[in-house]
Amino acid sequence: MARVKRGTMVRKRHKKLLKQAKGYRGARSRHYKVAHEAVMHALADAYRDRRRRKRDFRRLWIMRINAAARLNGTTYSRLVNALKQANIQIDRKMLADLAVRDPQAFSRIVQQAQAAVTA
């Protein structure tokens, strides 16, 4: 049986990792050891931030809804409660988009929700 040396596989693995580090500054894009560490940190950050992005956008939507709700004489908390009682099923993303792009429609939704609470 022929002896198998691992040079080709090592070269392939190193090239693959250096390709991932392309665009990094200095040794991070040229030296395998430094590039490996940089890529591992980058992948860890990307994984974490894909989850964080969802939280960040939800917070942004809530802030926008709260600001628009206060212009209509209520708060975010009261508005969400009123929407639930009025059985108006609209998610925070759409509500925030309405608040920014179509304030009149947002105001009508707020009025409908408040009417359902008082009735």
UniProtKB/Swiss-Prot annotation:
It comes from the Bacteria. The keyword Acyltransferase does not apply. GO terms for molecular function: rRNA binding; structural constituent of ribosome. Keywords: Ribonucleoprotein, Ribosomal protein, RNA-binding, rRNA-binding. GO terms for biological process: ribosomal large subunit assembly; translation. Disulfide bonds: none annotated. It holds the Pfam family Ribosomal_L20. InterPro entries: Ribosomal_bL20 (IPR005813), RIBOSOMAL_L20_CS (IPR049946), Ribosomal_protein_bL20_C (IPR035566). CDD domains: Ribosomal_L20. One of its GO terms (cellular component) is ribonucleoprotein complex. Gene3D superfamilies: 6.10.160.10, Ribosomal protein L20. Belongs to the bacterial ribosomal protein bL20 family. Binds directly to 23S ribosomal RNA and is necessary for the in vitro assembly process of the 50S ribosomal subunit. It is not involved in the protein synthesizing functions of that subunit. This is Large ribosomal subunit protein bL20. It comes from Chloroflexus aggregans (strain MD-66 / DSM 9485). The gene is rplT.
